[in-house]
């Protein structure tokens, strides 16, 4: 496995690859959710490149960039064990050669980025677009793999690829869950045992909503009430029913409905969703 620290080395390496290239962009602190993305890429491509880069432009004013976990040696060991071809680990100065005031400004599309997570984390998705577009330009993958857990991010990246006419296939990957059904997240490590049990209300609420839909309930207001009753012990930021343009729905639309939830358990903010 190659560890690529500079853009020049990455470009030289990329030129040597003649067959399909799968790409899994990450901020490190890899868990089994990331592992499932990597494993799918390994199955579907001749080569797999993983990036590990904690992107400063997607951190808000109240989010501590310096405190984000960076267990690089552990991440590299996992990638090597899985059979990854190369890991790109650039410094911030490599990815952003200019200071903020000199940088080309890129913005996520407003209709997808200003609600839900965008309403809470102002500018977050602009930062995501900044780094993902740079990584796509450098890696030039055949396919890129993103988890459905970050649904809003996934929709924005799919829109980005289509809008900028990029020849990259975006591969959405199912949400990876622990045995207790909690969605895998690097934030889960901040939960103590009591909070962990409380957090299980999130997947339970989504499962109960799914069961109600399967039984024929289509009214989003009724389904939302059902979910909020289960989430009542948590501090809920939102429980919303939207289509794939993130427009609010009153009635379930098969194959075009997202149920999105964000809730705080203690000091930890967790996301989960259901694709209907």
UniProtKB/Swiss-Prot annotation:
Q: Which reaction does it catalyse?
A: (R)-pantoate + beta-alanine + ATP = (R)-pantothenate + AMP + diphosphate + H(+)
Catalytic activity, EC: 6.3.2.1
Q: Which domain of life is it from?
A: Bacteria
Miscellaneous notes for this chain?
Answer: The reaction proceeds by a bi uni uni bi ping pong mechanism.
Q: What class of enzyme is it?
A: ligase
CC per GO annotation: cytosol
Identify the residues that bind ATP.
Answer: 27-34, 147-150, 176, 184-187
**Does Ion transport appear among the keywords?**
no
UniProt-listed SUPFAM superfamilies: Nucleotidylyl transferase
Q: What name goes with this protein?
A: Pantothenate synthetase
Q: Do you know which CDD domains this protein is assigned to?
A: PanC (cd00560)
Q: Name one GO biological process term.
A: pantothenate biosynthetic process
Query: Does the record bear Cytoplasm in its keywords?
Result: yes
Return the InterPro entries for the record. Answer: Cyt_trans-like (IPR004821), Pantoate_ligase (IPR003721), Pantoate_ligase_C (IPR042176), Rossmann-like_a/b/a_fold (IPR014729)
Q: So where does beta-alanine get bound?
A: 58
Residues annotated to bind (R)-pantoate: 58, 153
Task: Tell me which stretches of the chain form a coiled coil.
Answer: none
Q: Where is the active site?
A: 34 (proton donor)
Ordered alphabetically, the record's keywords are: ATP-binding, Cytoplasm, Ligase, Nucleotide-binding, Pantothenate biosynthesis
Q: Which family does it belong to?
A: Belongs to the pantothenate synthetase family.
Q: Name one GO molecular function term.
A: ATP binding
């Amino acid at each position: 496995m190659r560890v690529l620290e500079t853009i020049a080395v990455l470009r030289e390496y990329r030129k040597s690859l003649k067959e399909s290239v799968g790409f899994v962009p990450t901020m490190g602190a890899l868990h089994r959710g990331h592992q499932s993305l990597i494993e799918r890429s390994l199955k579907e491509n001749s080569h797999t490149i993983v990036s590990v880069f904690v992107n400063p432009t997607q951190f808000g004013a109240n989010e501590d960039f310096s405190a984000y976990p960076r267990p690089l040696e552990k991440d590299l060991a996992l990638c090597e064990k899985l059979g990854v071809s190369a890991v790109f680990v650039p410094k911030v100065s490599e990815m952003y050669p200019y200071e903020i005031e000199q940088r080309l400004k890129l913005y996520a599309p407003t209709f997808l980025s200003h609600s839900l997570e965008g309403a809470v984390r102002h500018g977050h998705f602009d930062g995501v677009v900044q780094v993902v577009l740079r990584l796509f330009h450098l890696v030039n993958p055949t396919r890129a793999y993103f988890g459905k857990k970050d649904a809003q991010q996934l929709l924005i990246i799919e829109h980005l690829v289509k809008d900028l006419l990029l020849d990259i296939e975006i591969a959405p990957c199912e949400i990876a869950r622990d045995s207790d059904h909690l969605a895998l997240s690097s934030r889960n490590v901040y939960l103590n045992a009591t909070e962990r049990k409380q957090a299980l209300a999130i997947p339970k609420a989504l499962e109960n909503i799914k069961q109600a839909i399967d039984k024929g309930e289509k009214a989003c207001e009724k389904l939302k009430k059902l979910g909020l009753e289960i989430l009542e012990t948590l501090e809920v930021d939102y429980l919303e029913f939207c289509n794939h343009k993130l427009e609010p729905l009153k009635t379930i639309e098969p194959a075009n409905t997202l149920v999105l939830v964000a809730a705080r358990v203690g000091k930890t903010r967790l996301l989960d969703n259901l694709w209907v």
